[in-house]
């Protein structure tokens, strides 16, 4: 049984309704609206007793087709419904199918920078699954062309050329921009700070100017918990002092301040998410960095026979087992937060994390459990600047955005990462 809620009745067709001349199609608890095959809906309801919700407003699709009597419009509408049904079937068979999704929207045009990277690629996939149109803008300096969902439009960018990004934004005509593109290696930022201020701040400013010029309504920014620096208390709330201790965190904080001014002076509504440790994967997209600094993919290199051992940096921290504690958030949960942030009226700064911390040793032990293999670890000295414990309070996002992580357990996060890495042991081909 994939779900946890029991159902006493079959409700295949009650989700479909005519709203303002269009159709709202609802996939509810495995059932499909009456535009889809009722037998298939019955099959889903019987086989997958789960709480699975996704709402789609197709009125704009129908209008683009030319109205009720337009034959081409009707074909487009029927194809759209068939696509929704196929997506429902795919999710039911997916190991991620226990996620309860509630996405209600008019479809939007979304411009995603850094959509060839780890977080951007998964967010692009989730946006497309939810019915949005996506343009991905990426210079591929860190990302991978094959990590871009084939359903998205791809623009090879040169963010340092103001005219390029302005033209791309004008052509896409987005209602929302999701800005993931950035340099994000703390250590590198300490040796090459100019690279970080140039890309994360100056190129970000170019994007902001393009957004204002194109009259974009919403800007969602990928910030970081590194803007806080060493926290005064844990769990960390959004009102903590921001005292970054490296150019990476400083560059993100500078852009946060720019967003506040652009909202005040230009009316650009924004949400900035301060991520903790993104991890996990979907069936199609996972984590592949050319320089891998993240713990979970590095640990998984051992059972993949790509390394003999993993490393533990510091075993004398004031934590129960002496190793650093971090907060891990599943990449799908992170993507869902971004879609919630796109709603009108949502704005401000939000932490994104599970609210539970796991030590380095606990992560290694969990990877051993999931892979069924022993993972040797070499103990090394602390790395400069590593705080003992970083754990988020995401209560503000829960209260104000209606967000709630669906993968709070480390085992589930590691399991999805392991499945992806087994299928893609060398990552993306490009």
Question: Which residues make up each language-model segment?
Answer:
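Short, positively charged and aromatic/hydrophobic N-terminal segments
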Residues: 77, 89, 93, 97-104
């Amino acid at each position: 049984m994939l779900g946890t809620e029991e159902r006493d009745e079959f409700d295949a067709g009650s989700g479909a309704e005519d709203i303002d001349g269009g159709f709202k199609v609802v996939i509810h608890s495995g059932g499909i609206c009456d535009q889809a095959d009722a037998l298939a809906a019955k099959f889903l309801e019987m086989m997958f007793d789960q709480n699975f919700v996704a709402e789609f407003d197709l009125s704009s699709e129908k209008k683009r087709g030319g109205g009720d009597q337009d034959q081409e419009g009707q074909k487009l509408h029927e194809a759209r419904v068939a696509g929704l049904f196929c997506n429902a079937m795919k999710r039911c068979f997916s190991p991620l199918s226990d996620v309860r999704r509630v996405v209600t929207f008019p479809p939007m045009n979304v411009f995603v920078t850094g959509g060839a990277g780890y977080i951007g690629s998964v967010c692009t996939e989730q946006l497309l699954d939810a019915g949005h149109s996506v343009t991905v803008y990426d210079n591929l300096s860190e990302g991978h062309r094959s990590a871009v969902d084939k359903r998205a439009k791809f623009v090879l960018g040169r963010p340092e050329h103001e005219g390029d990004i302005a033209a791309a934004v004008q052509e896409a005509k987005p209602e929302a921009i999701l800005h993931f593109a950035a340099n994000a290696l703390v250590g590198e930022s300490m040796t090459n700070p100019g690279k970080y201020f140039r890309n994360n701040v100056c190129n970000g400013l170019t994007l902001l100017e393009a957004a204002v010029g194109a009259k974009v309504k919403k800007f969602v920014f990928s910030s970081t918990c590194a803007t806080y620096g060493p926290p005064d208390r844990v769990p960390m709330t959004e009102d903590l002092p921001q005292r970054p201790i490296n150019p990476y965190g400083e560059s993100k904080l500078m852009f946060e301040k720019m967003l506040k001014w652009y909202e005040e002076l230009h009316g650009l509504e924004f949400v900035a998410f301060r991520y903790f440790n993104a991890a996990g994967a979907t069936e199609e997209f996972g984590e592949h960095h050319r320089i891998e600094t993240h713990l979970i993919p590095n640990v998984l290199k051992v059972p993949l026979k790509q390394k003999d051992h993993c490393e533990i940096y510091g075993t004398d921290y004031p934590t129960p087992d002496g190793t650093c504690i971090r907060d891990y958030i599943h990449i799908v949960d992170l993507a869902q937060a971004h879609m919630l942030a796109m709603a009108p009226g949502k704005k401000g700064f939000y932490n994104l994390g599970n609210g539970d911390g796991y030590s380095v040793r606990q992560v290694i032990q969990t990877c051993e459990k999931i892979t069924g293999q022993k993972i040797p670890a070499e103990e090394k000295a602390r790395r400069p600047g590593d705080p003992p414990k970083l754990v988020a309070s995401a209560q503000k996002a829960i209260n104000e955005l209606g967000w709630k992580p669906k993968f709070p357990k480390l085992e589930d996060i590691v399991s999805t990462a392991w499945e992806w890495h087994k299928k893609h042991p060398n990552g993306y081909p490009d």
